[in-house]
Amino acid sequence: MKRVVVLGSTGSIGQQALEVCRLRGYEVVGLAAGKNLEALSRQIALWKPRLVAAEESLHKELKARFPGLRLATAEEVAALEAEVAVAAIPGLAGLAPTRAAVRTGKRVALANKEAMVAAGPLLWREAEAHGAEILPVDSEHSALFQALLGERREDVAELILTASGGPFLREPEDLAQVTPEMALRHPRWRMGPKVTVDSATLFNKGLEVLEAKELFRFPLERIKVLIHPQAYVHGLVRFVDGSLKAQLGPTDMRLFIQYALTYPERAETPLKDLPIPGVLEFLEPDLKRFPALAVAYEAGRRGGLAQVAVSAADEVAVEAFLQGKIPFPRIPEILARVLEATPIEPLTWESLFAVDAWAREEAKRWA
């Protein structure tokens, strides 16, 4: 029986990962969560994990509900003996647990794009030193991973990420009118609040461009974004002969989570009628309407700590927007200001965490 650790178990990806584990009959040996007491309690009762990590404020109540429960840090949960760790703690808070999982040599099903964006070269160095696998969970990166299988690297001309365009692709004309409630209504995907807002600004796609750059170790200038409102084509690989290879499928994250858990096998799943839309549109992104995508590309050109800084600043800016402190168009403005002020230094674990802390404070100044 495959043993799995789920980091970020009460979030959207974490809960869907547990659904997949239940369907596949896997053993969940560790859970790491935040402050959602009721959801975590249900998971503990169902899975009876060996170790659990949660915010310290929950410890007393968890001990009262589950007297024999062993509490630990997220890093300790990540280091448990298991075949796979699902790394789904959002933001840079998920970086240290992801690193801990990689250092134990297990497969890491990576849903935390910020970890790869901020620390890609460092994580790959750790993975190669410890014999770990890093497989993508993001639908677009899983699509590219699948489309690249069996292909020679020198035959690949471009990697193409698709974006639905979010809820504001065409309206309202004035994005200053956008409220948090409007931004949290994504037309296609079931996701957590932060990534839903990032999808609305297209910064999520910018992070995915940077993730693809680091995950596939591929030149930034050959990674493209196309708006695809139907969200049925998840990623395309363009080859030097002009041909394209695409991965298509329904907008169900469980498929991509499952693939990261079962690869190289595909688990048999009940098939439904093919829901192929009548029309598949592909449009160039409007960088004037969605400048956050342009900021991400600029961070990628600078590389290293610039990617750390914009990722950290975005967490602060999105939270400020959700709290009603700043208007929607202010998010990319804050990212651009922080990027311009980012120091140029070599990327190390020490400089990464230092710039992460600096960028958050810098973003708060502008928020």
From Swiss-Prot:
Its EC number is 1.1.1.267. PANTHER family: 1-DEOXY-D-XYLULOSE 5-PHOSPHATE REDUCTOISOMERASE, 1-DEOXY-D-XYLULOSE 5-PHOSPHATE REDUCTOISOMERASE, CHLOROPLASTIC. It comes from Thermus thermophilus (strain ATCC 27634 / DSM 579 / HB8). Its cofactor is Mg(2+); Mn(2+). Pathway: Isoprenoid biosynthesis; isopentenyl diphosphate biosynthesis via DXP pathway; isopentenyl diphosphate from 1-deoxy-D-xylulose 5-phosphate: step 1/6. 1-deoxy-D-xylulose 5-phosphate binds at K113, S139, E140, S164, H186, S199, N204, K205, E208. Keywords: Isoprene biosynthesis, Manganese, Metal-binding, NADP, Oxidoreductase. It comes from the Bacteria. It catalyses: 2-C-methyl-D-erythritol 4-phosphate + NADP(+) = 1-deoxy-D-xylulose 5-phosphate + NADPH + H(+). Mn(2+) binds at D138, E140, E208. NADPH binds at T10, G11, S12, I13, G34, K35, N36, N112, E114, G192. Gene3D superfamilies: 1.10.1740.10, NAD(P)-binding Rossmann-like Domain. GO terms for biological process: isopentenyl diphosphate biosynthetic process, methylerythritol 4-phosphate pathway involved in terpenoid biosynthetic process. Catalyzes the NADPH-dependent rearrangement and reduction of 1-deoxy-D-xylulose-5-phosphate (DXP) to 2-C-methyl-D-erythritol 4-phosphate (MEP). One of its GO terms (molecular function) is 1-deoxy-D-xylulose-5-phosphate reductoisomerase activity. Signal peptide: none annotated. It holds the Pfam family DXP_reductoisom. This is 1-deoxy-D-xylulose 5-phosphate reductoisomerase. Belongs to the DXR family. HAMAP family: DXP_reductoisom (MF_00183).
